[in-house]
């Protein structure tokens, strides 16, 4: 690995345990920080645009705390046609989302940013991932939610856990995008910042 002095320290701007676990797979040292950003869609905003805007806002929020760092942020918005499916935040909303999605195709728009707060260079991408949900009974939905309680996950499902059982098929360029941190794109961005992984 290159000498650490050649690039700023890495900061993962996320409180997600799963994003942290994904980033650990790259075997590079990093710290975490939780950005304070209000997560909501603007009227008429496309799902990918919402995810990208929020990921950028998170990067700039973390940059205020770390003015000399490579800051990694991400956000994810699920969409069923024109309907945006954010974090349900309650059992009732999660039941409603899963009923709506059963047997249907949902697109997860995973936005990724790498912001160099030393140089103000921002790299950003949205990586879509298509998910076909199984036909689920109301009973299956209730049992799943009782076991996993995915109330802070876009689309009410944790694909990194039992939520994988809700899914019939996943299509996309990076399977990690569904969990919330597209590693393939992140590696490309880190290489642009001259971070050597091996």
UniProtKB/Swiss-Prot annotation:
This is 7-methyl-GTP pyrophosphatase. It is found in: Cytoplasm. Belongs to the Maf family. YceF subfamily. Nucleoside triphosphate pyrophosphatase that hydrolyzes 7-methyl-GTP (m(7)GTP). May have a dual role in cell division arrest and in preventing the incorporation of modified nucleotides into cellular nucleic acids. NCBIfam families: maf (TIGR00172). The record marks 18, 76, 160 as: Important for substrate specificity. Its EC number is 3.6.1.-. The keyword Transit peptide does not apply. Its cofactor is a divalent metal cation. Keywords: Cytoplasm, Hydrolase, Nucleotide metabolism. The active site is at 75 (proton acceptor). One of its GO terms (biological process) is nucleotide metabolic process. The keyword Cytoplasm applies. It catalyses: N(7)-methyl-GTP + H2O = N(7)-methyl-GMP + diphosphate + H(+). InterPro entries: ITPase-like_fam (IPR029001), Maf-like (IPR003697). One of its GO terms (molecular function) is nucleoside triphosphate diphosphatase activity. It is an enzyme of class 3 (hydrolase). Pfam families: Maf. GO terms for cellular component: cytoplasm.
């Amino acid at each position: 690995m290159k000498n650490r002095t050649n690039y700023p320290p890495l900061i993962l701007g996320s409180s997600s345990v799963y994003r942290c676990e994904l980033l650990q797979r790259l075997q590079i040292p990093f710290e975490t920080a939780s950005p304070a950003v209000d997560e909501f869609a603007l009227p008429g905003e496309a799902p990918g645009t919402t995810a990208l805007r929020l990921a950028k806002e998170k990067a700039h929020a973390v940059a205020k705390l770390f003015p000399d760092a490579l800051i990694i942020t991400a956000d994810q918005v699920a969409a069923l046609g024109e309907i945006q499916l954010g974090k349900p935040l309650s059992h009732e909303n999660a039941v409603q989302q899963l009923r709506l999605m059963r047997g249907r195709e949902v697109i997860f728009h995973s936005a990724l940013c790498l912001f160099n707060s030393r140089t103000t260079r921002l790299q950003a991408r949205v990586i879509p991932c298509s998910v076909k949900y199984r036909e689920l009974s109301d009973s299956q939905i209730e049992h799943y939610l009782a076991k996993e309680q995915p109330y802070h996950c876009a689309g009410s499902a944790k694909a990194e856990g039992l939520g994988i059982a809700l899914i019939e098929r996943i299509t996309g360029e990076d399977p990690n995008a569904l969990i919330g941190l597209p590693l393939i794109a992140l590696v490309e961005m880190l290489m642009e910042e001259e971070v050597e992984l091996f």
